[in-house]
């Protein structure tokens, strides 16, 4: 019982933090400002053993790895694999900010309203709108994710972290940006991405390249991308 109360308290705390993010969003969105402040001011930590999904008006504990899918109207469908049940919810207020927190030992994936799919690794969280704006597709990431971005020439997709931004039109890539790690990395599977560091220096990657990012320092090298994305398929690669 005490464990249940602790988890629920965590959900409430995270919901309050998200409310502050949403308040900032609604106040500044029309001014064209970025979402960096939302990520920097987000101090919620990931703990417990359940995936937590936070919307504008509720926090839900998902007991198993979850797969979410948003349609173009902002409605979401949640698939809890082990229970094989579906929970549907319709958003009455559009452009809500949602947050998913994935603890150690769990994973989740989301299909956004534009068709982009994101796989979220353990110990990670993502803040995102239920519907992307016509000319703006942005999400905030802490931890490790793999994205398969739906191509839209008129609307780049931007992934923001604490130390760098990634701008793409349509591609597949992996981002590893845990808060406790000294360095972060981006691995490009196919397509093209542009990484911008805190000091505004830019690095453009080609397929099968990785960029290590430590502060404002970057280093690009060629890699076997399968070693960096196998986690999303629950695979562990062993070398002889």
Predicted features along the sequence, with ranges:
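A residue-level detector for the "anchor" residue at the start of short, highly conserved motifs
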Residues: 5-12, 21-240
